[in-house]
Amino acid sequence: FVKKQNEKYTGMKAAIIPEIPKELTLSYIQKTYPDYLEEGKVMLGLDYNTVSPMMLEIAQGGMFTISGKKEKGKDIFVKYLLEAMLLPTFGNTELYILDDMTRRWSDYEYHPDTAVYDNTTASVQTIFDEVDQRVQSRYEDFAQRQEEALKSEPWIVIVIESSDAVAEISADNKIIGTIKGM
């Protein structure tokens, strides 16, 4: 039977039965699901019923925020999300990182896509002034129907891993207004 089937279907293979891997890493996703890596989209995981990718379309919303307690998996998820956004298929990404003294995010300090990395609060105001200026410029381009100019703009990602930076931001009405206006 096997010999007849092999002769009948020469050069063909059965489709691989999909499975949920023990750990869903970015390298596994790149190898197994390359067709799902698109600009503005990040694969969040696999649907357990269909073993099909579950996608996050960052372009569909304005600001996307993740918060949580330390040691609860937030950092792992955010680092995965960040690495996925740094893939060429996602589009250009620009990082602004406000780290704390533990320097958990120091791997990105000299990354070519990092605009600002600081583990003090010295650059909090500068970062939000710069990002606000860029966002307002994008709104103006959009209002003037210059959508093509917007396509070349990078994604702006701000990572805040500093309770001191959060306290400074929370106490500054100008920065709060900037965030609300994004």
Indicate residue ranges for each PLM-predicted region:
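Conserved P-loop NTPase
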Residues: 1-15
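P-loop NTPase motor module signature
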Residues: 11-14, 27-28, 60
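P-loop NTPase catalytic phosphate-binding loop
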Residues: 21, 29-182
